[in-house]
Amino acid sequence: MNQWRVIHNKSYEGAMNMAIDEAIFTAYKKGHNKPTLRFYTWEPACLSIGYFQKLEDEIDLDKCRCMNIDYTRRITGGRAVLHDNELTYSIIIGEDNPLIDKSINLSYRYISEGLVKGLNLSGIETDNLNRGERISRENLSAACFNAHASYEVTINNKKVIGSAQSRKDGVLLQHGSIILDFDVEKLFKLIKTKTPELKERAMKFTAKKASGIENEIGRKIDIDILQKNIVKGLAEQFNVEFVEGDLTDYEKQLVKELYEKYKNEEYNKKR
């Protein structure tokens, strides 16, 4: 049975979390590590924006500072995500791995199936995975959780896990937010819209489309137990053995270099 590395949950600021993900991604491209599953949380809470978003056009930076909300740009695409009461995962694996479909949608589905198995082991029932929905552009905001992409995990038809994927030089990085407690009002205090009326409409729309696991099942989740069960679910899905590990010395050096990039205002505002 193939062995993958798992790095268990630690809490970091946004720039550090993104630096670590990219360091693992880069090291894998150069043959320095195994396929890796990583869990992490965010301290302080952080608003991450997609690689192609325009930070100053879409995010209220003054409000972020006032509310002590960090912000950073992801290596992946998609829209803004408020990382607060959640467990985040990332998976780094070669595109040539037979488990990874060349289709982005089908690889999303395969990973989501493993996440669902982990939730089920935690006594959490989810909806059936589906191809997502066609969304009117009138309803779109800078926020990620106001639309269902293909094969995203939902409970009561509300997205509870939002993921984004990047592929480069034959390597796949997918990371995603497993939302425990979703605060839509807090999120939209940070999101810019053209008018207050549009913000109110977008907030109501998002509240119908997204939630947190705890909000939907009505009980608290032990994050350590959830993490262990997701490892089990993904191990079953991929038919691999996860071996606990940490960053290599090479990865740690990369993290130091990449951290400076993700902390740099010019990088975060470059679009």
Swiss-Prot record:
Record site: Lowers pKa of active site Cys: K159
Catalytic activity, as annotated: octanoyl-[ACP] + L-lysyl-[protein] = N(6)-octanoyl-L-lysyl-[protein] + holo-[ACP] + H(+)
Protein's recorded name: Octanoyltransferase LipM
Listed pathway(s): Protein modification; protein lipoylation via endogenous pathway; protein N(6)-(lipoyl)lysine from octanoyl-[acyl-carrier-protein]
Alphabetic keyword roster: Acyltransferase, Transferase
Gene encoding the protein: lipM
EC number: 2.3.1.181
Domain BPL/LPL catalytic: 31-242
GO molecular function: lipoyl(octanoyl) transferase activity
Note: In the reaction, the free carboxyl group of octanoic acid is attached via an amide linkage to the epsilon-amino group of a specific lysine residue of lipoyl domains of lipoate-dependent enzymes. The reaction proceeds via an octanoyl-thioester enzyme intermediate.
Subunit annotation: Monomer.
Alphabetized PROSITE patterns for the sequence: BPL_LPL_CATALYTIC (PS51733)
